[in-house]
């Protein structure tokens, strides 16, 4: 996983 969308 290159990044997490939970930051939005």
From Swiss-Prot:
One of its GO terms (biological process) is defense response to bacterium. Keywords: Antibiotic, Antimicrobial. Expressed in egg (at protein level). It comes from the Eukaryota. Possibly derived from Nedd4 E3 ubiquitin ligase. Has weak antibacterial activity against Gram-positive bacteria M.luteus A270 (MIC=47.2-94.5 uM), S.aureus ATCC 29213 (MIC=94.5-188.9 uM) and S.epidermidis ATCC 12228 (MIC=94.5-188.9 uM) as well as against Gram-negative bacterium S.marcescens ATCC 4112 (MIC=23.5-47.2 uM). Also active against yeast C.albicans MDM8 (MIC=94.5-188.9 uM). Has no activity against Gram-negative bacteria E.coli ATCC 25922, E.coli SBS363 and P.aeruginosa ATCC 27853 or against clinical isolates of C.albicans, C.krusei, C.glabrata, C.parapsilosis, C.tropicalis, C.guilliermondii or Trichosporon sp. This is Oligoventin. It comes from Phoneutria nigriventer (Brazilian armed spider).
């Amino acid at each position: 996983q290159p990044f997490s969308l939970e930051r939005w």
